[in-house]
């Protein structure tokens, strides 16, 4: 009588057949990688608040979190980048199309090195809102950008938490 092939046994072709067991629906929510957008004003300079906020994210959610910013080199997002990488979190930035692509850029290579256009700043908000699960905004936002930002939040059904 032939023995039936079970999990982990070597079959005729010499390859090991492995079947992944189901872990249940209760634990599936923990497997999803969370994308948290932390964006802010270029004049925001409270480094301690940003550092403590990112540290609390790491302590509460673990290191399987992706921090998303617009890639600004000044203000809040400069410190978000520094501390997200320092604490070992994944980091993605959606910098404007007129800049060069870097190691942490979220768009493809052909998106970058374009001539400057004023709507590129608004397109950053599109990318951030589209790719994030939670959005936190440090400091104030310009009125011209706020209208566009609020429309995007309504379109994608997301909410933002404004922090000072």
Residue ranges of each PLM-predicted region?
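Acidic/glycine-enriched connector segments
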Residues: 18, 22-33, 44-164
């Amino acid at each position: 009588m032939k023995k039936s092939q079970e999990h982990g046994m070597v079959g005729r072709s010499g390859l090991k057949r492995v079947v992944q067991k189901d872990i249940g629906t209760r634990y599936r929510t923990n497997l999803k990688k969370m994308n948290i957008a932390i964006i802010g004003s270029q004049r925001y300079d409270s480094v301690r608040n940003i550092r403590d906020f990112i540290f609390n994210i790491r302590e509460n959610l673990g290191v399987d979190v992706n921090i998303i910013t617009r890639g600004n080199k000044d203000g809040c997002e400069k410190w978000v980048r520094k501390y997200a990488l320092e604490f070992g979190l994944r980091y993605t930035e959606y910098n404007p199309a007129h800049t060069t692509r870097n190691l942490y850029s979220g768009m493809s290579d052909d998106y970058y090195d374009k001539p400057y256009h004023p709507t590129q700043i608004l397109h950053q908000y599109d990318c951030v809102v589209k790719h994030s699960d939670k959005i936190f905004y440090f400091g104030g936002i310009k009125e011209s950008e706020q209208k566009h930002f609020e429309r995007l939040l309504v379109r994608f059904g997301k909410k933002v938490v404004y922090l000072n």
